[in-house]
Every structure is written in C-alpha cells, then in structure tokens.
C-alpha cells in the first residue's frame, strides 16, 4: 500500500479552491457527463473536458465526489491544470482506540479502477499542474497515480494525496 501526502497552503493564486470556491472560467467535468458516484466510468467525460480546452491550455475542475476511471486521464496539451476542490482527508475520532485517526472522506477523488494510471501526462507537455486531489488505486493497488511519460517541463503537483496505489508518481525523463 502506498500513501503520498503533499500539502500546500491555500492562497489567492489557487482561488481558494481547496476551500470549495472557484470563480475563474473553468471547465467542470460534470458538464461533460462525469458523475462522482464511485461507480460510473468518467474517463471519457474528463478527457472530453481536456479536449475542449483551447490550444493554449486551461483549467479542468474536478468537484467533490469519487470519479472512477477505467482509462487514464490523458493530458496532451500544454498549460493544462487539473484542479480538485480539496483532497478529502478527514479525521476519525474512535472513542475505543487510536486506530484509523485519519482517512479518506469527501473531497475530489479519482479512482483508477481499471486504468493503468489515473493521470497520464504525455511526452513533451509543459506547464501541467495537478492540485487538490486524492488519487486512489481502488481495491487492487496495481496502478500508477500520476505518470509523466517523458520529457515534460515545469510540471507542478500540489496538495495531492495518493492511497492504495502501486506507484504514486512516476516521472520519466523530466527536465
């Protein structure tokens, strides 16, 4: 089992998305048919949201919910930001013991059910940002969370939590 926690503070540059607000003109994946119910494959809908971005890139918002992926989210444009509202960790108070005091709950979550990677950044992409998400391998723990496939430049990962993954982040030939 793999757990990766990268934390950053929220500030005006992120439009306070980790607190649940966004005011930029952004593409919300639910407008493309993604359903965060933990059952429905959302791969095509999220990839359609990315495809709809202009050639210079843009922001794709993953709202709260469990968005299942049977194929990877493929980033094949420069300056694409995948932005969740928050990574969804909560504390659990167990009056009978101190086990499991922190666990997943709520937030923006990608579940790589049958995808080899939840997010795949294609070779040569520049300015990719992925933030405020939980990435899960589902029940199998055989997946990669975020895969930079080759010479990518200026990629930023911020406020990402990975759970139940074989490999959290795989970076190949980065500059």
Language-model features, listed with the residues they occupy:
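C-terminal motif of bacterial Sec signal peptides marking the signal peptidase cleavage site
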Residues: 6-9
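Right-handed parallel beta-helix/beta-solenoid
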Residues: 14-45
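A short, polar/charged loop/turn motif at coil->beta-strand junctions and beta-hairpin connectors
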Residues: 21-28, 104-106, 124, 129
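Short, histidine-centered active-site or binding-site loop motifs used for metal coordination
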Residues: 31-35, 114, 134, 139, ...
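N-terminal extracellular ligand-recognition/capping segment immediately after the signal peptide
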Residues: 47-50, 54-100, 107-115, 134-135
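Glycine-rich beta-solenoid repeat tracts in large extracellular/virion proteins
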Residues: 72-76, 89-102, 117-124, 142-151, ...
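Right-handed parallel beta-helix
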Residues: 79-85, 126-137, 153-166, 175
């Amino acid at each position: 089992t793999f757990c990766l926690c990268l934390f950053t503070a929220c500030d005006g540059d992120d439009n306070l998305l980790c607190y649940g607000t966004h005011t930029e003109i952004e593409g919300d994946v639910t407008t493309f048919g993604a359903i965060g119910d933990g059952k429905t494959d959302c791969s095509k809908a999220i990839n359609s949201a990315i495809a709809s971005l202009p050639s210079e890139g843009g922001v794709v918002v993953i709202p709260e919910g469990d968005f299942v992926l049977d194929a990877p989210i493929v980033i094949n444009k420069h300056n694409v930001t995948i932005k969740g509202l928050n990574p969804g960790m909560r504390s659990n108070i167990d009056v009978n013991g101190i086990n499991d005091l922190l666990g997943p709950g709520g937030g923006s979550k990608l579940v790589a059910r049958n995808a080899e990677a939840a997010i795949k950044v294609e070779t040569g992409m520049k300015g990719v940002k992925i933030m405020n998400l939980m990435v899960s391998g589902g029940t199998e723990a055989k997946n990669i969370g975020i895969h930079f496939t080759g010479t990518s430049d200026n990629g930023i990962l911020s406020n990402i939590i990975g759970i139940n993954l074989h490999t959290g982040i795989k970076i190949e030939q980065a500059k």
